[in-house]
Amino acid sequence: MSGAPRLVFAGTPDFAVPSLQALLEAGHRPVAVYTQPDRRAGRGRRPRPSPVKQQAEAQGLPVRQPESLRDPRAQAELAELAPDLMVVIAYGLILPQAVLQIPALGCVNLHASLLPRWRGAAPIQRAILAGDDETGVCLMRMEAGLDTGPVLARARCPIGPRETGGSLHDRLAALAGTLLHDRLDDLLADRLPAQPQPEAGVCYADKLRKDEAWLDWRRDARQLDRQVRAFNPWPVAQTLCQGQVLRVWEAEPVAAPAGDAAPGTVVRADGDGIVVVAGEGALRLQTLQAAGGRPLGVREFLNGRALQAGERLG
């Protein structure tokens, strides 16, 4: 292409910010940044701009916030920009075929998994829930299907034994920015071979639901541990304690205690943790949040709370 490439960036949450920054650090200022419309949030229900919008405006970049890219007017406005390439990461709006065909070099997406594993909305948490040892980021050419396009580049990332949804989110966000920065010149020069995704190994990362956060004490303690870690910081694992919702922010699996206590039974509650029997093994709760309270370490949580061995959770 002659002259500087005309790039459009599309993203919305914190996860997309490092990739926008990567474009800027590589010397490319997008001709427009697309992000979702401001959403009402907080106690005052005031419109709140997305993290990508805040970053774009801080850099003096033009921002566009259509409600939908299915709207012919929004498509016409995008076409008027005459983009060479559209970079998409966690945008949250569907790009119809008419939009995918607008940029001269097409649209590419940065996805937080090693495709074809974990296509879909929640690949970070699903990887932890499944007990995967590894994940990563894929740069792929977009098609009409859900995360089905050929992969142009990928970067791998181990999942640590105490990894949470939040910590893995942050590491993958940074990795996506690095991958984009390192491969951008080859991408713009069309030097990245497109590798079709194999059919073997395809699985889908469904959107997280709040009702998945309930801990079923009949399950293996290792599964419960993965649930606690995957759902930190949202929707946060929870159980019932003395008739009230108790959120569990941090826990770890431990050996099963002696005896035949039923799953959900508290067998110890002290400054080292609240140990609860599981279907296999036990779970030691370390950071908890009572209804209406804030997250507390177990020692502080137990101050003034009469939680005794023999009580049942759930």
From Swiss-Prot:
GO terms for cellular component: cytosol. Keywords: Protein biosynthesis, Transferase. (6S)-5,6,7,8-tetrahydrofolate binds at S113, L114, L115, P116. It holds the Pfam family Formyl_trans_N. Coiled coil: none annotated. InterPro entries: Fmt, Formyl_trans_C, Formyl_trans_C_sf, Formyl_transf_N, Formyl_transf_N_sf, Formyl_transferase-like_C_sf, GART_AS, Met-tRNA-FMT_C. Residues 34-69 are annotated as: Disordered. CDD domains: FMT_core_Met-tRNA-FMT_N (cd08646), Met_tRNA_FMT_C (cd08704). Its EC number is 2.1.2.9. This is Methionyl-tRNA formyltransferase. The gene is fmt.
